[in-house]
A protein has these predicted regions:
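Short linear motifs in intrinsically disordered/low-complexity regions
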Residues: 1-6, 30, 49
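Bacterial N-terminal signal peptides that target proteins for export
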Residues: 2-16
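Bacterial N-terminal signal peptides
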Residues: 14-26
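Sec/Tat signal peptide C-region and signal peptidase I cleavage site
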Residues: 26-34
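N-terminal secretory signal peptides
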Residues: 33-78
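Compact alpha-helical subdomains of small soluble proteins
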Residues: 60-132
Length: 132
């Protein structure tokens, strides 16, 4: 009796093929789903910045929310290949000046001034909780 033609091998092969047919598309599509989630998270953060009524400080100069979002979008385009998580986006595109190293700050409606990193990480956490 050949092993390759035995009933047990045929059953195992059949089970493996069935598994691949049923679960293969989901497994193969996972990276695309991850990229889609990353894109959605980043777009949410950019919209969050743009639609806020906050003032942004970059190198000690005040900017509108729209200007801040546009600046972050440009930095995102420059670092796209290095950004694998929303936290990477915040760290690379929305935290500090590449030239001076100075942190970005956000002046909230109540006058409190916090780093853009802390503000955006909090916004990201809220977004994730709402996605559950």
């Amino acid at each position: 009796m050949e092993i390759g033609n035995s009933p047990i091998v045929k059953k195992i092969t059949g089970c493996i093929l069935l598994f691949i047919l049923l679960w293969g598309p989901a497994v193969l599509d996972e990276p695309a789903a991850g990229a889609n989630n990353l894109s959605k998270s980043i777009q949410h953060l950019l919209a969050f910045v743009k639609n806020s009524e906050c003032q942004f400080f970059r190198n000690d100069k005040a900017h509108t929310a729209g200007e801040a979002a546009a600046h972050m979008q440009r930095k995102y385009e420059n670092f796209k290949d290095k950004i694998k998580t929303p936290e990477d986006f915040i760290r690379l595109a929305a935290t500090k000046s590449l030239i001076t190293g100075k942190l970005y700050y956000v002046k909230l409606k109540d006058g409190e001034k916090i780093t853009s990193e802390a503000w955006l990480l909090q916004a990201l956490e809220t977004y994730r909780q709402n996605q559950r």
